[in-house]
Amino acid sequence: MKLALLGRQALMGAMAVVLMAGVSVKTFAAENLLNQVKERGTLRVGLEGTYPPFSFQGDDGKLTGFEVEFANELAKHLGVKADLKPTKWDGMLASLDSKRIDVVINQVTISDERKKKYDFSTPYTISGVQALVKKGNEGAIKTAADLKGKKVGVGLGTNYEEWLRQNVQGVD
């Protein structure tokens, strides 16, 4: 009985060490990235640059929008300059994974799968699934099931594509 209790305590202690090691590694990685950003003097920010009002090219050809302003303020808070890196959505997370960018400031849906790999800020916008149909076609599509057999356009690799594949059979 004492041996079993001792074994459980050892197991719990080992689990605590493993959990703390995970936290320490994550904290170390974040501190390491922050040090790299400060040494470099720039925060490399991935954003699409094609999505008004969040990030887009203004009349002067420069990136502008809410996410651009947010990126500049974040960099200023860190004592560095923002290096804006317009990136197509289908390559955004790969750019983060390969360390071509330091942070993504872009409309990114938080999913359980993504939370396993990435840290997320508090959401600054909330969006849902919407549909747009041609004038005169309003009555033909009222529910997701009405999309069956129809051609539907969604962004490649977006949560909308995932939702469509999971919720509508036979969509093209």
Question: Across the structure, where does each feature detected by a protein language model lie?
Answer:
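Flexible hinge/capping segments at coil-to-helix
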Residues: 134-151
